[in-house]
Amino acid sequence: MSLFTNKTLLITGGTGSFGNAVLNRFLATDIAEIRIFSRDEKKQDDMRHAFQLKMPEVADKIKFYIGDVRDLASVKNAMYGVDYIFHAAALKQVPSCEFFPIEAVKTNVLGTENVLTAAIDEGVKSVICLSTDKAAYPVNAMGTSKAMMEKVIVAKSRTVSPEKTKICCTRYGNVMCSRGSVIPLWIDQIKNGQPITITDPTMTRFIMSLDEAVALVLFAFEHGESGDILVQKAPACTLQTQAEAVCELFGGDKRNIKVIGIRHGEKMYETLLTNEECAGAMDMGNFYRVPCDKRGLNYDKYFKQGDTTRNTLTEFNSNNTELLNVEQVKAKLLSLQYIRDEMGKQ
């Protein structure tokens, strides 16, 4: 990882699943320092002790900063001397954001504005922001706040030279076994002899591992241009398929799956690339790149100039991507350390 040699990386919301995955990936490399910025001192203390036990020889590379992305002063305090930022801080629970939408705006929209403002002021070289498929065609408060976050990112990228600060965004689907995701809940339900609860068996969701989430961010870091939104071509599955896979791995009864109905703000399927974005998107193999629209507000010159280019890409959603079967989902789950650890406890 030569790009990170002797560099300082700041991760906002760094005590979450993504932050832990980044630490596992980078801590033993020649990176100089990784700063964890978050508002929960208990989670920071837990993370500190965990890495002191797991990787004692390099744990001193981790520096902890208590603060909130809503507070510009605390963000700036953590930003001094930082080379790169992975911005993962967010409110991401869909039902909670439905009841407290302004809180989602404060963290996901205004908090992102604070991070980018501080990054530009401090001369940070690269900022990669984490978004979600729920930002595409949003129907809920969380998705709407993330869609606005993406607009802030693109707008902010227009105000600064990419040679000074490059600002990119990644958009991805459900990360399996991440904090607050459904699979750990199902495992607990099986172990306690309770029914597995699913909202709708035909609902589809993109699925990816934490390692794949980190890989997407690194792809954006290395190949993205300022203002880009980068999307991974992730597979998907139905909730029924996912629940059956978990049952088979953990000895659950597939007849004991209980349908509880869709929760506040949920969609039947998710979209990673919209039809509108397809007009300017680029196919990059395992990824799509949605470049920033670099036109200004003076449209007259564009009308005169014209543009005859057409794109053959179509909307990419969890209904038209590759749908995995039970065996394929089981194989994907077995690749996760969390699943192997939980199976070892049986």
Model-derived features with residue positions:
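Strand-loop microenvironment adjacent to phosphate/nucleotide-handling motifs in alpha/beta enzyme folds
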Residues: 151, 155-177, 181-346
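Rossmann-fold scaffold of SDR-type NAD(P)-dependent oxidoreductases
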Residues: 12, 79-88, 129
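Conserved residues in the N-terminal Rossmann fold of short-chain dehydrogenase/reductase
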Residues: 38, 65-66, 106, 200, ...
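Conserved Rossmann-fold cofactor-binding substructure of NAD(P)-dependent oxidoreductases
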Residues: 63-84
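Conserved Rossmann-fold NAD(P)-dependent oxidoreductase catalytic core, especially the SDR/UDP-sugar
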Residues: 87, 91-147, 151, 155
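Conserved glycine-rich Rossmann-like NAD(P)H-binding loop of the short-chain dehydrogenase/reductase
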Residues: 30-43
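Hydrophobic/aromatic anchor residues within beta-strands of the central parallel beta-sheet
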Residues: 64, 104, 127, 167-170
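N-terminal Rossmann NAD(P)H-binding glycine-rich loop of SDR-like oxidoreductase domains
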Residues: 7-29
